[in-house]
């Protein structure tokens, strides 16, 4: 499903070249559950942006579902971001003036769905994450955990095959973090590929595979043992 080969990403800042990624090669198969870890500046967020087609590498190849991403047009990339990949962000990225269901339905607007269809699908997603009774609440009327559930529902609304979660529990307390990870577990069991950035070891062990980055290179790629995984 995902194959990146010798990916490099360099930024020029004044006279300095920042080597965010320096030759990363990685394959991720359909229905894998992968955690990306590394210290600040390791390149994990840069890699996540490239995997999500939000950024392009300086060199190297990225193949998604047997298609080289560099060969895709802007319209094709937009369709991939809207339909093939669901994004979950640490800061939720909800629109403050919209209700919960309207936030969940935003990807359906870009997909050209009619309002009633958007509402029906958004309500199904909100029910799936336990927030059907909060459909008409705005983000400032909800807790952090509830906002993250809305973000998860939004990520699922177009039935993407890949979920990219960037520090999905970073702003949450321990109890709420466990609840969110249980939802991600369920998403994976239903057949989605889940790729998650986290700096928390206990959260990383929900994944079946742990990839560590350091200084822009792949430091290790290991399989989590069943005894390590928190259920």
Stretch-by-stretch model annotation:
Residues 1-213:
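ABC family nucleotide-binding domain
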Residues 209, 217-231:
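Conserved beta-strand-loop-alpha-helix hinge in the C-terminal portion
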């Amino acid at each position: 499903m995902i194959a990146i080969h010798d990916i490099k990403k360099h930024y020029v800042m004044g006279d300095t070249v920042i080597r965010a990624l320096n030759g990363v090669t990685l394959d991720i198969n359909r229905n894998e559950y992968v955690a990306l870890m590394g210290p600040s500046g390791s390149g994990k967020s840069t890699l996540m942006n490239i995997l999500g087609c939000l950024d392009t590498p300086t060199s190297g190849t990225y193949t998604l579902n047997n298609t080289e991403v560099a060969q895709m047009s802007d319209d094709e990339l937009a369709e991939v971001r809207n339909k093939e990949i669901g994004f979950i962000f640490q800061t939720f990225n909800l629109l403050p003036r919209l209700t919960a269901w309207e936030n969940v339905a935003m990807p359906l607007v870009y997909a050209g769905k009619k309002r009633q269809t958007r509402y029906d699908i958004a309500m199904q997603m909100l029910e799936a994450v336990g927030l059907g009774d909060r459909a008409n609440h705005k983000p400032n009327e909800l807790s952090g955990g509830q906002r993250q559930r809305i973000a998860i529902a939004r990520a699922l609304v177009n039935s993407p095959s890949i979920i990219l979660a960037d520090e999905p529990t970073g702003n949450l307390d321990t109890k709420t973090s466990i609840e969110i990870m249980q939802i991600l577990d369920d998403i994976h069991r239903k057949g989605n590929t889940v790729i998650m950035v986290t700096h928390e070891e206990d959260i990383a062990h929900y994944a079946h595979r742990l990839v560590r980055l350091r200084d822009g290179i792949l430091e290790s790629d290991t399989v989590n043992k069943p005894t390590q995984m928190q259920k």
